[in-house]
From Swiss-Prot:
The lineage of its organism: Eukaryota, Metazoa, Chordata, Craniata, Vertebrata. One of its GO terms (biological process) is phospholipid catabolic process. This is Putative phospholipase B-like 2. It is found in: Lysosome lumen. One of its GO terms (molecular function) is phospholipase activity. Disulfide bonds join C142-C152, C492-C495. Interacts with IGF2R.
Length: 589
């Protein structure tokens, strides 16, 4: 076929289309430049500018020093004994699927300076990973080409109002341990942001963080609910989508108590860091206040994220805390999501982890200022109350908390754990009042037992297979389990084909056929599944250690490989192409 000349009718049409496309591109670029300030777009790391894709070093250690005469803060290489804080990053992502970050602060300095310094040194050692993670996950959030003006303005206004309300509460309650920890958390985030931008200066008065800057990395869980509450037209959350599996297993004879968690997430998020924070914070702002019990914490996390987000924590207080998301399907409850009177979930879990000594105190701290966002079932395991080989203490070993907008329900589940020998969590509320209030009965009526607490696929698999767990290795196998092509409990009767990769302890939704027929979004083909497992035991938790594996399960299935997957075009900077890693033991000297 001969291409039409511009003078012909077809040529004039081609020329008009070309001009329109060029104009659209220019406008898109201008809009992108205009909106970059609103979205908090981040620059390439300073040392990598002009060199293409940033390349993180195999290891890096940096310290933040305070000049006693000038009061100036200065970043230096290496670990210095007089530093306000130091951090070391070992990048083994290509070898194990994990980078490892160790961060210490110095108790000779006040809490506020320690917190700010913690953020500074973390960004200083992980800036390349932060850049790549941002590009993979949130660069277009409220940004060019995917911008919803109304929603993004509402989100920005909500976050600004919430930050302002918290600032007032910190001023009004300047002797409160709770608000002291909130302030330290925000200072740590401020230090992270300042350090990445190359403008380190401790804020001596009021300070703020950018509502659509690095705060976006902290509120990824809260955003799932804020999007709905603030009427975002297009949300990324698939109806029915699972978000983590967890199992607490009492071994025969009560000889050990194992705690395990696997995170379900979009595969773009598989740039992982295992973190160790050793803070020297006091509980409250007073000089005579004692050290916070949760200053030592090990957790699975992500670049630029100062909490777990999975969530899974091993704490120096003897607690292990973890959650799976239960969400909210009842539109009438979104009225409880307000910018004032609430602290977003990510920050409440940081404060509870740092201040609590047991499950009761953890729940009391966490349920204050319920935001109604990132609605989860939390499990608080207190290893101090567990006696290996002993009878049930009756209470304190396991506390379960469930949150939805306007409601938090808490109960001690120790007796049930000892009676059944396991507690499983799989994104469905266990409390009847929460289940009913969250709108799930309507989904059960429409779609059947897939949405029910006892009848969902994972509920049935855990009930059938928990007795196979007798040590750490068998716990790891169960938490990686996905034999959806052969397991009758993985069948979806309303699907074509019936076997479904979502219906397993560790999902592999990428393996569902793109041309299949499915009753709701969670069962479709998606770049989504279980992306890790973390397991600890009585002895490991006491030593702040764990077993961990990174990447989608490949025990019964082929390993995930970006280049051969249907999602090869998705941005996944810094990630290995083939995810075929074995479990490792995570420990620090």
């Amino acid at each position: 076929m001969v291409a039409p000349m511009y003078g012909s009718p077809g040529g004039r049409l081609a020329r008009a289309v070309t001009r329109a496309l060029a104009l659209a591109l220019v406008l898109a670029l201008l809009v992108g430049l205009f909106l970059s300030g609103l979205t908090g777009a981040i620059p390439t790391p300073r040392g990598q500018r002009g060199r293409g894709m940033p390349v993180p070093p195999a290891s890096r250690c940096r310290s933040l020093l305070l000049d006693p005469e000038t009061g100036q803060l200065r970043l230096v290489d290496g670990r210095h004994p007089d530093a306000v804080a130091w951090a070391n990053l070992t990048n083994a992502i290509r070898e194990t699927g994990w980078a490892f970050l160790e961060l210490h602060t110095n108790g000779r300095f006040n809490d506020s300076l320690q917190a700010y310094a913690a953020g500074v040194v973390e960004a200083a050692v992980s800036e390349e990973l932060i850049y790549m993670y941002w590009m993979n996950t949130v660069v277009n959030y409220c940004g060019p080409f995917e911008y919803e003006v109304g929603y993004c303005e509402r989100l920005k206004n909500f976050l600004e109002a919430n930050l302002e309300w918290m600032q007032k509460e910190m001023e009004l309650n300047n002797g409160s341990a709770y608000w002291h920890q909130v302030r330290l958390t925000l200072l740590q985030l401020k230090g992270l942001e300042d350090s990445y931008e190359g403008s380190v200066a401790f804020p001596t008065g009021k300070f703020t963080v950018k509502p659509l800057g690095f705060l976006l990395l902290q509120i990824s869980g809260d955003l799932e609910d804020l999007e709905v509450a603030l009427n975002k037209t297009k949300t990324n959350h698939a109806m029915g989508s699972g978000s983590c599996s967890a199992l607490i297993k009492l071994l025969p004879g009560q000889r050990d108590l194992l705690v395990a968690h696997n995170t379900w997430h979009s595969y773009q998020y598989m740039l992982r860091i295992m973190k160790k924070y050793w803070f020297q914070f006091r509980e409250g702002p007073q000089a005579e206040s004692t050290r916070a019990p949760g200053n030592k914490v090990i957790f699975s996390s992500y670049p630029g994220t100062i909490f777990s987000c999975d969530d899974f924590y091993i704490l120096g207080s003897g607690l292990v805390t973890l959650e799976t998301t239960i969400g909210n399907k009842n539109p009438a409850l979104w009225k409880y999501v307000q910018p004032t009177g609430c602290v977003l979930e990510w920050m409440r879990n940081v404060v509870a982890n740092r201040l609590a000594l047991d499950g009761d105190s953890w729940a009391d701290i966490f349920k204050r200022f319920n935001s109604g966002t990132y609605n989860n079932q939390w499990m608080i395991v207190d290893y101090k109350a567990f006696v290996p080989g002993g009878p049930s203490p009756g209470r304190r070993v396991l506390t379960v908390l469930e949150q939805i907008p306007g409601m938090v329900v808490v109960a001690d589940r120790t007796s049930e754990l000892y009676q059944k020998t396991y507690w499983a969590s799989y994104n469905i509320p266990s409390f009847e009042s929460v289940f009913n209030a969250s709108g799930l009965p309507a989904l059960v009526a429409r779609y059947g037992p897939w949405f029910s607490y006892d009848g969902s696929p994972r509920a049935q698999i855990f009930r059938r297979n928990h007795s196979l767990v007798h040590d750490l290795d068998s716990m790891m196998r169960l938490m990686r389990y996905n034999d959806f092509l052969h397991d009758p409990l993985s069948l979806c009767k309303a699907c074509t084909p019936k076997p479904n990769g979502e219906n397993a302890i560790s999902a592999r939704s990428d393996l569902n056929p793109a041309n299949g027929s499915y009753p709701f979004q969670a069962l479709h083909q998606r770049s989504h599944g279980g992306i890790d497992v973390k397991v600890t035991s009585t002895a490991l938790a006491k030593a702040l250690r764990l077993l961990a594996v990174s990447g989608p399960t490949w025990d019964q299935l082929p390993p995930f490989q970006w280049s051969t997957s249907p999602f090869s075009g998705m941005l996944h900077m810094g990630q290995p192409d083939l995810r075929k890693f074995s479990p490792i033991e995570v420990s620090w000297d």
